Amino acid sequence: MMKDSVIRFWLTHHYLHRIAKKYPAFFDQLMYEVCDKKREQLIMTKRYLQREKFEAIALDLNTDVRNIFRIHKQVIEKLIKI
């Protein structure tokens, strides 16, 4: 069960990079529909479209890196549930 969850999480993360690279407009629309808050959408856009590291995103948003990880994980879990 845990192994399946990790694999699903990793595959979603991997394909988000590919989608963001090939179809940036589609990625923006997907994040707009999936993310409840503007902050979640901003984090995902910075991570996948602008290819920023979590530490750089945390500095830009003036928050802790763990908070960025938590929000990122929540959004990916929402995508998995779709």
Describe the function of each predicted region:
Residues E33-Q41:
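Short helix-coil-helix linker/hinge
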Residues I43-M44, I57-A58:
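Hydrophobic positions on the alpha-helical face of helix-turn-helix-like DNA-binding modules
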Residues L61-I82:
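DNA-recognition helix of helix-turn-helix
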Residues M1-E33, E55-A56, N62, K81:
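N-terminal interaction/assembly modules
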Residues T45-E52:
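Short helix-capping/turn signature of helix-turn-helix
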Residues Q41-L42, R66:
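Short, solvent-exposed positions on alpha-helices
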Residues M44-T45, I76:
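Hydrophobic residues on short alpha-helical segments
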